[in-house]
Amino acid sequence: MGEYITACGISRKICTQGPDGMLKETLGGQPSIRKYVAHKIAQLENSDRDMRSLFRLMFSEKENVLAESTDGYKIRSLTYGESLENVRRKTARLAALLGGVPRGSVVGLCLANSPDWIETFWAILQAGYKPLLINDRLDDGTIADACAACGVKAAVSEGRQFGVRHIRLAQLLEDADASSVTDDRFENEIFLMSSNSSQHLKICGYTGEQFYHQILDSAAILRRCRAIKKHYKGRLKLLALLPFCHIFGLAAVYIWFCFFSRTLVFLKDLAPDTIVNTVRKHRVTHIFAVPLFWETVYKSALVRIRERGHRTYEKFLRGLKLCGVPLLGRLITRFGFREVRDNLFGESVCFCISGGGAISADVLRFVNAAGYPLSNGYGMTEIGITSVELSGSARVRMRGSVGAPFASAEYRIGDGGELFVRTPPAAKGLFCDGARTEQDGWFNTHDLFAVKRGRYYIQGRKDDLLVCSNGENINPDMTEQLFRADGVQRVCLLPSPRQSGKILLVAE
């Protein structure tokens, strides 16, 4: 039986951790989410803590639904058991296509988010190779440099080639005899490319041991935060929006939740209407995205509200200001902003995370006030995901904290305001400008942070500071948020190309 649970003041009929309903069918025979998580973690702790162990446990609930997608009409589902068989077939095909390539070599993976990405990722490992997760939005030169740095021998893609042996995805989809496939050659290392924000290409190596710690952190989050484990009508479904080739998408979306055999919902394309319609059609419960996504949601909603007239817009602004008030705010969210939810994602969304950069206070306030619990999080390719705000209070989430570091992580703020992180899930090896180094100890993120009452707040990036003629440092991330006006879509601070120490304000 389901029961009504209130999150941010919105009553929703959902199946809970009780013994009845659809939810129990997805818990591997365990009577509750808490016991199911404890059972899976105990299995992981008693394993070899490598990628093979992670693979076996991730696909152990074969009847659970791994993926959903739609062609616009019918929802298509893929179970973990069906996907497991696909992995075995892809492994057999890959082993044949990589004949002559020594096992232990690096194989590039350049695909968009899809069940094929997941299956090819595991097939590369099961065949005895190490995947390099390639961001297909990068230019050919950057990707070629990454392939050279890692010694990539072959790459799987839908068409792009990078000067190494090319394997088309279509070749892996051909039928193959998987009867001889075993996992005794399973590799235990993968490589991710950084976002290259520092203008230096970095490639980070991770093993099963690092993901073991990431999963322990996710289990601790599930114990501390009620919203993150909520199911809507017996199902927990994450929107597969973030690229799996990035640490945020790989760890927080795929590894965290698919280890516990939850469901991913894949998009046909990234058009705004497609995203909104997919969330509503599939009843997506969790959306993790970068700040730009949430800013787009906010601005689109404002446009629609303004179209309703000045009076409606003024009422909306007054309600928005009151949403941080504990009791009154919940009532406004529940009743006053119901129409906002009807025009956005509907009522199924239970938990959201913004990560990958600073998010404005206006956006946080709006999304939380609308009834979608949005928390700010933090992580980097080099260190994994290390913190997220877990408060059940909308007022706390609106402040923009990334919370306290996870149990496995330590934070320290240096004299210049830069955040240093020490954590077992950090990447073990780094390729930077072609040279490999082993990472150990405190990692300098070069991100500026402040800490208040144990909660950490992103202040910007040290590399982005602008130096004025009087020697004062200006932080664009903090300053740009002060320049808000009707009719202005975005603002940007830039150093003057003509006068040293002068700063230009550009508005659109």
What positions do the PLM features span?
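Conserved pre-ATP/AMP-binding loop-to-beta segment of ANL
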Residues: 63-65, 175-193, 199-200, 226-237
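Conserved AMP-binding/adenylate-forming
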Residues: 76, 93-138, 241
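Conserved AMP-binding A3 loop
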Residues: 76-81, 189-216
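Conserved AMP-binding/adenylation subdomain of ANL enzymes
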Residues: 215-237, 244-339
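N-lobe entry segment of adenylate-forming
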Residues: 1-99, 103, 160
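Gly/Ser/Thr-rich phosphate-binding loop
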Residues: 285-288, 298-396
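Flexible, low-complexity linker/hinge segments
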Residues: 42-49, 144, 167-189
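AMP-binding/adenylate-forming catalytic core of the ANL superfamily
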Residues: 413, 417, 423, 446-508
